[in-house]
Amino acid sequence: MAGSLDDSIYNNGRSGGGGGGFKFSKGFNKDSISKRIIMMLFFSKGIRAWSCIILLYFLQSSISIISASFYMCLFSAIFSVVVEKPWNLLSSLRPSQIKKIIYHSIFNLLIIITWNSSIKFIGPIGSILASDYTFSTYPLIFNSLLQGNFLATDMSRGSIMLMIGYFLIPLFGISNRLDILGYTSSQVFMIGLFSLIVHNVLVLWKKTIVRSWNSGSSGGKNKLSSLGSCVSTIILFVFKLFEGFSSGSSGSDSINQVSYSQLFVIAIITFILYSLNQFIDDVSEKELTFNVLSKVSLTSSVIFGLLAALFIGFKDFFHPILILSFIFIINAIHILYSKSNDIQPMTFSNNMDGGNSSIKTYNSSGGGGGGSIINGNGSGNAIYYFEILKDVLRQIVDKPTSRRIFTFLVINLMFMFVEMAYGIWTNSLGLITDACHMFFDATALFIALVAEVISQWKQNDKYSYGYGRFQVLSGFVNGIFLIFIAVTILMESVERLLEPPEINTDKLLLVSVLGFIINLIGIFSFHGDHGHSHGGGGGHSHGGGEKKEKHHGHSHGGHGDHQQVTPILGEEKKKKRSVNIDGVFLHLLADTLGSVGVIVSSLIIQIWGYTLADPICSLLISILIFLSVLPLIANTAKTLLQCTPEPIQSSLYQINQFILSIDGVHNIISYHFWSHYDDMNIATLKIQLNETASSNSTLDTERIKKSISKYLNKDHNIHKCIIEFIPLLYNNNNQQQGNDVPLINHHIHNDIHHNHSSSSSSSSHHHRHN
């Protein structure tokens, strides 16, 4: 297993000195110690592989995943409590320590459940190959994916081989006995792949988080970990009781009846998988390089698995594709960690033992190895990208709108995972399908969240107007997404109207009610922003105020001036909308309508047996979704196509008349009005000056520019104005030449900050061209 459930239970074999760890007698030389450690590692990993094979038969025949996880967590907690005696810490627990205990319990709970799920749906040998040492290989794969340049360096080629080896295991290395459990091959693949990836990510996450804690001595950390195991056991016991009630009501509770002999075997398996395995790892990591350690461990697992398959049968747990995956993984590790690539081993401290044990990862010193990945100073590409991720999370939390999107995204994903897990548990296709539908909603929320974060970035040379238009693009994409959903539901409804299918309403009503509640929370969360976008409410905390602060560097204190401007233009409130939030709101509204339709149709079917209620409700919902999303697509498309905003379009005549009435203006050659995003309207004008203004260009153009800018900002909500002045020229015969050969081509670029008075226009930029 790629990470221990409770690292505290195997530290009793170490000394408490500064060097710590298991020590051999001085009578052994270094080569002798290495050989003995390799033999000890080889046989211990083989015994672990056999233990996982026995665990597979328990999971497939007599014990569920929840029950097996409970018993294993119980025995692990007992071993830990006996060794660490954590009750001495209970009387002096601090809030920070309680928080760490909760973290330990959650990690332990999820890691052991996903591990047992991987054993059941992928098989023991495949799970070992695809999970061992991934806390070291996953960051390397992640770094290679971010760098690109596939197959260009040894590091990228090795990463590709690792990904192929890992992916082949859940794709082809499934157990053939799973067909008797009522799962299809696609279900086995998805469940196995999901469990394996989540398990490996949790192990990596646990090591990263716990390693960053500074809680004093390793003994204190071990006691906290022991208490975390006890909390995990209690939570799993509650899950087991709930599972027992559910299976008892359905008459299938015999699967979780465990005998004393089976409990004894599970206790031995737990000791081997967690205590003995980690103790051997701790000893081996101090004397062996990562290259040798990983090769010996994985080779032992495959060889002992083959030996067991010779007596038990290959079809039960050992697919031939595992050998190919093993070859890919071993060769990739050799490429990535060999001396030829200048990869120097470094230590990755164990997450529970205060840094006494270490796992050797990688530190490429450059050259053809693809650059530094991780080094002792915390630099390198992988750490760099993790720092970027932390900064993005900080940006999300800082802004109220993005914080609400992120919060609801997490709630949506949690409900999706619970629904998926319960659907797999009960083998309910309806629950699994609804969970997949919620995944599309989560995708829409993720798109909106990304757009909300990017839109706050400052303008630069490449994006001179900033990143605000990403919100418009997000709204347009989500609108197209909703059109696709509406058309799909419409086609399915018509098909069901023509050929009504048999409908199983089991658990459908419960799931629909829960989904309705979740979506209702989201609707109320985003309704304020959505109402604001249509003119409801005068607050600016989630709309233009944040963008103005980001793009122009002004505080919210300037809103008072802005509020003096908005009443003059009655149509401005209509334009103050966040199409990004509109897209999220419409997604939630569509999902809520879907839940309402399912609730209504389920009640009609259960009460009156009228099965056509389901396609009729779906048909009505698809039409409502289609009609509600059309305004969003129309508005975002007009913005992306740079159409003249509707309030300005209806006032073009007044704008032209005002500009022509200014002293010094001879003609308007061309004008363009467009919206960059929700709160930024832009005007570009080419104005021809008369003879008087042309002869005194600097003073007159400044006066004309101020008049036009003030008028457009105050009366028409135009925030940026770019004006090009063309003089009216005369030739030697005193005939007007228009703007054929201008002597002065004077561009005036004026940024109008709408939370300031019109006097700020004096900060405009002047460019002269001959």
Curated annotation (Swiss-Prot):
<feature type="transmembrane region" description="Helical">
    <location>
        <begin position="124"/>
        <end position="146"/>
    </location>
</feature>
<feature type="topological domain" description="Extracellular">
    <location>
        <begin position="491"/>
        <end position="507"/>
    </location>
</feature>
<feature type="topological domain" description="Cytoplasmic">
    <location>
        <begin position="1"/>
        <end position="36"/>
    </location>
</feature>
<feature type="topological domain" description="Extracellular">
    <location>
        <begin position="58"/>
        <end position="62"/>
    </location>
</feature>
<keyword id="KW-0862">Zinc</keyword>
<feature type="topological domain" description="Cytoplasmic">
    <location>
        <begin position="529"/>
        <end position="592"/>
    </location>
</feature>
<feature type="topological domain" description="Cytoplasmic">
    <location>
        <begin position="206"/>
        <end position="224"/>
    </location>
</feature>
<feature type="region of interest" description="Disordered">
    <location>
        <begin position="532"/>
        <end position="566"/>
    </location>
</feature>
<keyword id="KW-0813">Transport</keyword>
<dbReference type="GO" id="GO:0055037">
    <property type="term" value="C:recycling endosome"/>
</dbReference>
<keyword id="KW-0812">Transmembrane</keyword>
<feature type="transmembrane region" description="Helical">
    <location>
        <begin position="225"/>
        <end position="245"/>
    </location>
</feature>
<feature type="topological domain" description="Cytoplasmic">
    <location>
        <begin position="456"/>
        <end position="469"/>
    </location>
</feature>
<feature type="region of interest" description="Disordered">
    <location>
        <begin position="751"/>
        <end position="770"/>
    </location>
</feature>
<protein>
    <recommendedName>
        <fullName>Probable zinc transporter protein DDB_G0291141</fullName>
    </recommendedName>
</protein>
<dbReference type="InterPro" id="IPR002524">
    <property type="entry name" value="Cation_efflux"/>
</dbReference>
<feature type="transmembrane region" description="Helical">
    <location>
        <begin position="405"/>
        <end position="425"/>
    </location>
</feature>
<dbReference type="GO" id="GO:1904257">
    <property type="term" value="P:zinc ion import into Golgi lumen"/>
</dbReference>
<feature type="topological domain" description="Cytoplasmic">
    <location>
        <begin position="147"/>
        <end position="154"/>
    </location>
</feature>
<dbReference type="GO" id="GO:0016020">
    <property type="term" value="C:membrane"/>
</dbReference>
<dbReference type="InterPro" id="IPR027469">
    <property type="entry name" value="Cation_efflux_TMD_sf"/>
</dbReference>
<comment type="similarity">
    <text>Belongs to the cation diffusion facilitator (CDF) transporter (TC 2.A.4) family. SLC30A subfamily.</text>
</comment>
<dbReference type="GO" id="GO:0006882">
    <property type="term" value="P:intracellular zinc ion homeostasis"/>
</dbReference>
<dbReference type="GO" id="GO:0005385">
    <property type="term" value="F:zinc ion transmembrane transporter activity"/>
</dbReference>
<keyword id="KW-0864">Zinc transport</keyword>
<feature type="topological domain" description="Cytoplasmic">
    <location>
        <begin position="636"/>
        <end position="770"/>
    </location>
</feature>
<feature type="topological domain" description="Cytoplasmic">
    <location>
        <begin position="284"/>
        <end position="291"/>
    </location>
</feature>
<keyword id="KW-0406">Ion transport</keyword>
<feature type="topological domain" description="Extracellular">
    <location>
        <begin position="313"/>
        <end position="316"/>
    </location>
</feature>
<feature type="transmembrane region" description="Helical">
    <location>
        <begin position="593"/>
        <end position="613"/>
    </location>
</feature>
<dbReference type="InterPro" id="IPR045316">
    <property type="entry name" value="Msc2-like"/>
</dbReference>
<feature type="transmembrane region" description="Helical">
    <location>
        <begin position="317"/>
        <end position="337"/>
    </location>
</feature>
<feature type="topological domain" description="Extracellular">
    <location>
        <begin position="426"/>
        <end position="434"/>
    </location>
</feature>
<feature type="transmembrane region" description="Helical">
    <location>
        <begin position="101"/>
        <end position="117"/>
    </location>
</feature>
<feature type="transmembrane region" description="Helical">
    <location>
        <begin position="263"/>
        <end position="283"/>
    </location>
</feature>
<feature type="transmembrane region" description="Helical">
    <location>
        <begin position="435"/>
        <end position="455"/>
    </location>
</feature>
<dbReference type="GO" id="GO:0046872">
    <property type="term" value="F:metal ion binding"/>
</dbReference>
<feature type="transmembrane region" description="Helical">
    <location>
        <begin position="508"/>
        <end position="528"/>
    </location>
</feature>
<feature type="transmembrane region" description="Helical">
    <location>
        <begin position="37"/>
        <end position="57"/>
    </location>
</feature>
<feature type="transmembrane region" description="Helical">
    <location>
        <begin position="155"/>
        <end position="175"/>
    </location>
</feature>
<comment type="function">
    <text>May be involved in zinc transport from the cytoplasm to either intracellular organelles or extracellular spaces.</text>
</comment>
<feature type="topological domain" description="Extracellular">
    <location>
        <begin position="118"/>
        <end position="123"/>
    </location>
</feature>
